[in-house]
């Protein structure tokens, strides 16, 4: 009876919190207890929110997302995995300790192993997967770190397949790296399908059926389509989650939140606040339309092909706003301009491109000259007037000389005929 009352209290606490969070102002930063967090747009790879995203943290059972990814990439759902004796030594939560006793040598389908791993978070099943996929646990750890490197998780080092860190300080990752991992698992249909389940019926080949429930309390709430919880004393409460609303998909990660036992709501409140902020966040203008983002220095002949040379600085501009989500990350903006002919310059013709980048996000924009060929002509108008006057004088003098020569010739002929 007490458990039912506690469960109802937790449920209504979460519902109240999530409903209140939904109406929070879109332009206010989310309030979270977690010491490290991120929101990433999985379509564009833009970082919508960041808090200490490169700070190394213990990920606890979120580690199992990498274990799940390697299982999905190396086994089929119907493949059988053998339960090793060493798996019995893994700490709770373990299927063999907390759900139903398992005898070494018993087998699980890869499908049931995936369900137990991601829903129940079975530590012994993670060990079983490691030995069956890698041959040994150590070889599997090597596979985990190689995969992390391939995904661009440059601040990650795995030591265990389940995230237990009692005996090591070398098992770590970052919120940013876990967002990259979430992107990879979201792309895997098997894992994506598994994380959406609220519960699953599983069994070993020699054991009875058992129901394992999803420890992600947010599944199915306000667009939550999956996630992985985690907790150790070193890591604090952790949660990585996937959200989808109106076809828009976000990844959220919270590390180092509080485990407010027995209700255990804080990390879920943190995640809900992140999701609501992420779907309502507005970008801010980083560089405004028609603003100068750089300049190009070049030399040209004041009169095409001839005449003295002149050096000019050409402003490089954009014809649209460059907008980014407001975060504590520093954007980079680089421009690249092609070969320029000053006599064909137009403010409406692209002369190259600019690339704005924030961590793994990049977007290109066309760039334009801030001046046209007419501006160059106007800047040299006095020279052209002077040159024209000189030309007129020269032509006049030439014509005058020619006229004198012709007059002398006519006078000479007239004397001869007299």
Language-model features, listed with the residues they occupy:
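Sec-dependent N-terminal signal peptides of Gram-positive bacterial secreted proteins and lipoproteins
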Residues: 2-26, 383-404
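Structural motif marking the loop-to-transmembrane transition
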Residues: 2-4, 59, 106, 110, ...
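Generic "edge-of-domain/loop-turn" microfeature
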Residues: 6, 12-15, 19-21, 44, ...
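A short hydrophobic/aromatic micro-motif that marks alpha-helical segments and, especially, helix-coil
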Residues: 17-18, 78-79, 137, 203-204
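Active-site-adjacent loops and short helices of periplasmic peptidoglycan-processing enzymes
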Residues: 24-189
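Domain-terminus/edge residues, biased toward the C-terminal soluble/receptor-binding domains
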Residues: 153-157, 169-391, 396-416
